Amino acid sequence: MSKHPANSSATDPVDNLQTLIRCPSVTPAEGGALSALAAMLEPLGFTVERMVAREEGTPDVENLYARLGTEGPHLMFAGHTDVVPVGNEADWTYPPFSAEIAGGELYGRGAVDMKGGIACFVAAIARHIESQGAPKGSISFLITGDEEGPSINGTTKLLEWAAAKGERWDACLVGEPTNPDQLGDMIKIGRRGSLSGEIIVKGVQGHAAYPHLADNPVRGMIKLAEALMHPAFDAGTENFQPSNLEVTTIDVGNAATNVIPARASAKFNIRFNDTWTAETLRTEIIARLDTASADPLLRPGRPPIAYELVWADRPSQVFLTRNNALISSLSAAIEKMTGKTPALSTTGGTSDARFIKDYCPVVEFGLVGQTMHMVDERVAVSDLEALTGIYGAFISSWFTHAGA
């Protein structure tokens, strides 16, 4: 094992997290967070590179890639330093970027989502280097500043940039908060897919007292929305809950109570399991809308509902990770440090793991997520130490299994 001089401050997850929280990196601003992270990693022997991603019509975003080692096996840790806005700062018990500790908890925006996970993984690898030397292989940090934003200039472009330079990975751990109640509850081994769209129905505007002279698009829109939500798309699968579609908005752009609107629109999102792909779901949704729009009882004496369907860009495909070395190493580390056997889950929303899956097997494990995005976001100091221990045990176990 090669030796690198360890930065003693990097071995303390609390110090690491306080440093990161004090950087106001509200998406897409870097806020000093990537510079602070680089200052932790470089003394450990990491080669740190900064990459600025650009796309017309979107803000430039700074990202970071750091690697220790040149040989395989290669473990990636992925995450983000950007955070959501703080809301009304006056509602916070402590200033959101002060990283105050009170009652055994560390307060600050990003404490849970997900500067805490980064702080713990840095501490874990720093302790490993200090006690055992660098792992026999390579370890890297892939950290974006565009996860809480549109995710255009973040992980996708950073992965493409790194892969174009010849980087290849054997496995990835994403440090997102995965635990519902207690540290050790849950590992995410996959994610449902996500597909969104908008339906537009055009009618004829008129006076509410003279409906025969108008054509109310809301009547048709209600039927189309019902057709999307019922019946259920499926009953779920072995590893996934049932697919679920929600109509999230219905708008007519009309504030008057005596005017029949000329246009109605509705947006929807479906979280889908491995019964479907985005392509097969599009076909199913169009079939449901066509059937509902042609119902002769809906518009007697009038033509079928004319609707327009607009799909949102970049649907997320469903995925499931089946990699024994990765999952068993992490599960064993969690059980060793907490005494809990973690559930292997695919619940919840999407994450940047959906991009990483195309490059290597990926799982997610981090802190307890109860206060993420909330006023007074906070983490138990004891959980930071425990997560650092879990990550440390995982690093040792994974390199042992992957190098065997």
Curated annotation (Swiss-Prot):
Catalytic site residues?
Answer: 82, 147 (proton acceptor)
State where Zn(2+) 2 binds. Answer: 113, 148, 373
Pathway annotation: Amino-acid biosynthesis; L-lysine biosynthesis via DAP pathway; LL-2,6-diaminopimelate from (S)-tetrahydrodipicolinate (succinylase route): step 3/3
Quickly give the catalysed reaction: N-succinyl-(2S,6S)-2,6-diaminopimelate + H2O = (2S,6S)-2,6-diaminopimelate + succinate
The name this protein goes by in its record: Succinyl-diaminopimelate desuccinylase
Q: Per its Swiss-Prot or TrEMBL entry, what cofactor is needed? A: Zn(2+); Co(2+)
> Pfam family of this protein, just one?
M20_dimer
Q: What is its EC number?
A: 3.5.1.18
- Read off the InterPro entries from this record: ArgE/DapE_CS, Bact_exopeptidase_dim_dom, DapE_proteobac, Peptidase_M20, Peptidase_M20_dimer, Peptidase_M20A
Q: Which family does it belong to?
A: Belongs to the peptidase M20A family. DapE subfamily.
Please tell me where Zn(2+) 1 binds in this chain: 80, 113, 176
What's a single GO MF annotation on this record?
A: succinyl-diaminopimelate desuccinylase activity
State whether it acts alone or in a complex, and with which partners, per the record: Homodimer.
Top-level enzyme category: hydrolase
Cofactor: binding comment: Binds 2 Zn(2+) or Co(2+) ions per subunit.
